[in-house]
Amino acid sequence: MTRKAIYPGTFDPMTNGHLDLVTRASLMFDHVILAIAASPSKKPLFTLDERVALASQVTSHLDNVEVLGFSELMAHFAAHQNANILVRGLRAVSDFEYELQLANMNRHLMPTLESVFLMPSEEWSFISSSLVKEVARHGGDIAPFLPAVVTQALFEKLAAQ
């Protein structure tokens, strides 16, 4: 039986913390879908197509990782992809309450859907896309936190605003 997992998120932009988790998930599962949510309510800086393209570049070395965009409920997307495992990252205890609510709702919507929680490597445990964007907007050095292609894209996007 193929172990197919989905690692969902907005990935606006994809950080080294995200890359750490998808890389580790790719070692645990036969096939991993990096599922990029449209998330219009979050007002992402990058379009869905841009986020999919960047994530595809960043994960191109991971043979068992596929990058897809989606705009439906995660449980419905998982069912359409024949996946029954969700990979989620937990950076801090504060993430747990929200993730527990999501896991329970997803299980209610799709009883066979299990959530697996991974903690990022310590060096990435404080990184979030929102924090990186804020540092970039104020001229801080974000290169240590993002893949190089994402760093360049973020500076280009901010310069165009």
Swiss-Prot record:
Its EC number is 2.7.7.3. It is found in: Cytoplasm. Keywords: ATP-binding, Coenzyme A biosynthesis, Cytoplasm, Magnesium, Nucleotide-binding, Nucleotidyltransferase, Transferase. InterPro entries: Cyt_trans-like (IPR004821), PPAT (IPR001980), Rossmann-like_a/b/a_fold (IPR014729). The record marks H18 as: Transition state stabilizer. It holds the Pfam family CTP_transf_like. Homohexamer. This is Phosphopantetheine adenylyltransferase. The lineage of its organism: Bacteria, Pseudomonadati, Pseudomonadota, Gammaproteobacteria, Enterobacterales. The gene is coaD.
